[in-house]
Amino acid sequence: MNPVEKLALLRAEMKKRHLDAYVVVTDDFHASEYVGAHFKAREFLSGFTGSAGTLVVLPDAAALWTDGRYFLQASQQLGGSGIELMRMGQPGVPEIPAFLRDHVPENGWIGFDSRTISNDFARSIGEKTREKHIRFAGDEDLVDLVWADRPALSCEPVWELDVKYAGLTRREKLAMVRGKMKEMGASVFVIPSLDEVAWLLNLRGNDVLFTPVFLSYLLLEQDTATLCVQREAVSAEIEAHLKSDGVTLAPYDDIYRLVAALPTGTRVLLDGERANYRILQSVPESAEVLDRTSPIQLMKAVKTPAEQENERLAHIKDGVAVTRFIYWLKHTIGKEPITELSASKKLESLRAEGEHYLEQSFDPILAYGAHGAIVHYEPTEETGIPMEPRGLCLADTGAQYLEGTTDITRTVALGPLTDEEKRVYTLVLRGHLQLGAAKFLHGCMGENLDMLARTPLWEAGLDFNHGTGHGVGFVLGVHEGPERVHWDVKRQKRHCVIEEGMIFSNEPGIYLAGKFGVRIENLVVVREAEVNEYGRFLALEPLTLVPYDRDAIDLSLLSSRDVELLNAYHAKVFAAISPYLSGDELEWLKAATEPVQVC
C-alpha cells in the first residue's frame, strides 16, 4: 500500500469513532529519539523516514511537521502522498496545537495513542483547543488496526554494564537519585525514559537499534524500586543482582496499574517532557504531580572519571577505524566502483574489527555531492549513488563500544574541488576550530558558545539550520541532553549550564542544495582549565581523533590562530593514532597531519 491508501484506511477508522483529527508522532512509549520497528507508525503511514516528525490526519487533509534537518528529505519523500509538509520554525508555519485549534470543529475530538504522546505535548494541545471545547480520545492505537504486518515489540536480552566502565555502582546511583527526590519533596519518581533507566541500573539492552537500551519503566520510592520490564528479557542472574540492590521486577505494562494504585497524598515526580500522557492520566486525583525536569538528566550528562577515560579509549579505536577508512576511500576511488552504500559498509567493517565494538550509534550518513546538502541523508539500495574521483563526500557516522559512544563527521575530498567547495570547507573548519578552542567561565551555556562556531560563516553571509552541538550518552543515545549548543534562545525550552565532565559535539556545517554539503564534527569533553580571582574557567578537550582533509582547505582563508589550532590538533591525532597503523596507512597519516604553513 502507498501512503494515500494507508491514510484512507486510517480515516475509515477515524470516521467510525467520530474523530476529527488523529495525531501520529515519531515516539515510542518512552519519548526515545530512535525507536524500534514496532513504533514506526508515522513512517508507515507517510513514507517519511526521518528521525523527527509528527503527522496530523484530518478527514480531508494531512500535514507533517519536521525540523530544518529534514526539509529537503521530507519534501522528496512526501511527494504524491497528499501530505502537506510543515517546515517547523519557518514564517507562516503554524505549530501543531494552533493547527488543530483551527481545523477541528467546536466540541470535536482529537485522537492519538496516549502512550506515545508526551504530557507536555498533550497539555499544549489542550491549552490551545480549550476555547472550542475540543476533547481527547487517547485510549486506542488506530494505526495498529491498519498495519497488518506490524513488527512485534522487541524483547532482546538485558545485559549488565560493568562498574569499571560506569564508574558508579547501581546502589550509589540509586542513593544519588533518592537524595534528589528528597530535596524535591517527592515520595515516588516515575522514570519512563529508557536511557535513564539503563543509566541508573547499569543495565543495557538491544531493543532499540543504535541505542543499547531495553523497554522498561522504573517506579522508584525511598525504600523500594520496581522495574517494569518484559520478564523474559531478564536472566535469573541479573534478576538476583537487582534484587540484592532492592529492585524487584514487574510486567512491562504494569506501570499504569502501579501508578493508578499510588496511595492518597503521594507526591509523584515525573518529567512532563518525557512521561507519556497515559502515565499522567493514571495518577490518582488524590496524589500530587511534581512536573519537573528529571534529575537523572544532569547526573547522566556529567560523565564520571571512569566514563571519561573509557570514552578516550573508545575514540582512539574509532579514530583508527575512520582514519583507515579515509585512506581507503581516497586511494580506491576511481580504481574500483564505490557507492555511498558500499562505502558505508566498508567503514562499519573497519569499526567491527575493534575490540568491544557493539553496533553503530545511528544510521550512517555517507553523502556524495548534492546528497551532502541533505542534512540527515541516509544511503539505501534505492537512493545510494556511485561516487566519482572529484568533489566532496560527507561522512557522518558513529559507533557503540563497551568503552563509550562515538559520533564523528568528516567531509572528504575525493579528487579535484571547485573554489567554492574549498571556500565553504575552510569556513566551516574555521568555525569548528574556534569553538574547539573555547575557554570560558563556568556558568556559560551552550547559547553562549554557539557564536564561536558560526561567526566565520555569518561573516560570509552563511548559516546552517541545525544545532552546533548536542550531548552524547555513555553507551547510550548518541543524542542526549540537557546540554545543547544552539544560538536560537527562543527554541530552547530548558537551559543548561555547561559543566565539567559533559561530552558534546562540535559540528558546524554548510549545505548548498543541489550542489554539496560540508560538516565537520568532533566530540569534546569539558575539563577545568584554571581557577583564579575571576572564577573557574573551563575548556574543551577533543575526544575525536581523525585528521581534517588538507586537500579541501583554502590556506589563504586561514588566520595564524587557525593554523596554530589546526597543527596542534593534527599533532595530537598523529600521536594517538599512529601506533596502530603501519605501512602505507601510516605514511598517509604522516602526510595528512604534517604542520601547515601559511606565508
Regions found by a protein language model. Give the residues of each.
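Active-site neighborhoods and metal-handling regions in enzymes and metal-associated proteins
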Residues: M1-C599
